[in-house]
């Protein structure tokens, strides 16, 4: 694994300690070698499906898939890509809830490698530190860019924000459509899945939790 920041290392260790890290191994090959190997195998998979890779629309698809896997939709498996964090001392003594709603979520179901599409809401009560609002979106995106199950993703986000912000007072709410349900199997186009995770005051105080949910469920 490439060199990673202290924040990334702390988050990774916290996930491992809680048993909620994505099951993955440190690759032994360089990225270029991995892209070449994936493209070679995808070429064979597509032939087995019955596609003619001599067609100019298909011939570069194995390479496109390899690049997409390594550099894009699974880039969150490499903690070297963890967002750079600039924590700001809470000198203004902000004590009200900070909440970001409707963060775009696009991830990949680890069971069938099809899309998970939804929204994420994150809230926290600052203690000693705050972070830029865009960093919240970037952290969500990082953990979405790996094969996922929604339940684990929700817990990973909770732990990541608790670790970075150095507070237990964090809430995460995820609402998503799973294309493994929508595009195959039962082919249900209407259902969605909701998961949530709470820490600190959000877990202990019902009124605080209700205040958070009142905005995300509008």
Swiss-Prot record:
Molecular-function GO terms, alphabetical: GTP binding; GTP cyclohydrolase I activity; zinc ion binding
Keyword tRNA-binding: no
GO cellular component assignments: cytoplasm
UniProt keywords, alphabetically: GTP-binding, Hydrolase, Metal-binding, Nucleotide-binding, One-carbon metabolism, Zinc
UniProt GO BP: one-carbon metabolic process; tetrahydrobiopterin biosynthetic process; tetrahydrofolate biosynthetic process
InterPro entries tied to this protein: GTP-CH-I_C/QueF, GTP-CH-I_N, GTP_CycHdrlase_I, GTP_CycHdrlase_I_CS, GTP_CycHdrlase_I_dom
Reactions catalysed according to its record: GTP + H2O = 7,8-dihydroneopterin 3'-triphosphate + formate + H(+)
Record text on subunit structure and interactions: Toroid-shaped homodecamer, composed of two pentamers of five dimers.
NCBIfam families linked: folE (TIGR00063), PRK09347.1-1 (NF006824), PRK09347.1-3 (NF006826)
Name used for this protein in its record: GTP cyclohydrolase 1
Organism: Haemophilus influenzae (strain ATCC 51907 / DSM 11121 / KW20 / Rd)
């Amino acid at each position: 694994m490439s060199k990673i920041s202290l924040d990334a290392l702390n988050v990774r260790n916290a996930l491992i300690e809680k048993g909620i890290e994505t099951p993955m191994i440190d690759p032994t090959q360089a990225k270029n070698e991995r892209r070449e190997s994936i493209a070679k195998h995808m070429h064979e998979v597509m032939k087995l499906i019955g596609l003619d890779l001599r067609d100019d629309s298909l011939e570069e698809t194995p390479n496109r898939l390899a690049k997409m896997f390594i550099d894009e939709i699974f880039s969150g498996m490499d903690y070297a890509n963890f967002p750079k964090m600039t924590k700001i001392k809470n000198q203004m003594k902000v004590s009200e809830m900070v909440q970001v709603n409707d963060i775009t979520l696009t991830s990949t179901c680890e069971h069938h490698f099809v899309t998970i599409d939804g929204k994420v809401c994150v809230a926290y009560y600052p203690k000693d530190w705050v972070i830029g609002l865009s960093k919240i979106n970037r952290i969500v995106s990082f953990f979405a860019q790996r094969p996922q199950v929604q339940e684990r993703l929700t817990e990973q986000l909770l732990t990541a924000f608790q670790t970075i912000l150095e507070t237990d007072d964090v809430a995460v709410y995820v609402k998503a459509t799973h294309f493994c349900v929508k595009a195959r199997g039962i082919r249900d186009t209407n259902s969605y899945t909701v998961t949530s995770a709470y820490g600190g005051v959000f877990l202990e105080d019902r009124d605080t939790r209700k205040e958070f949910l009142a905005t995300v469920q509008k």
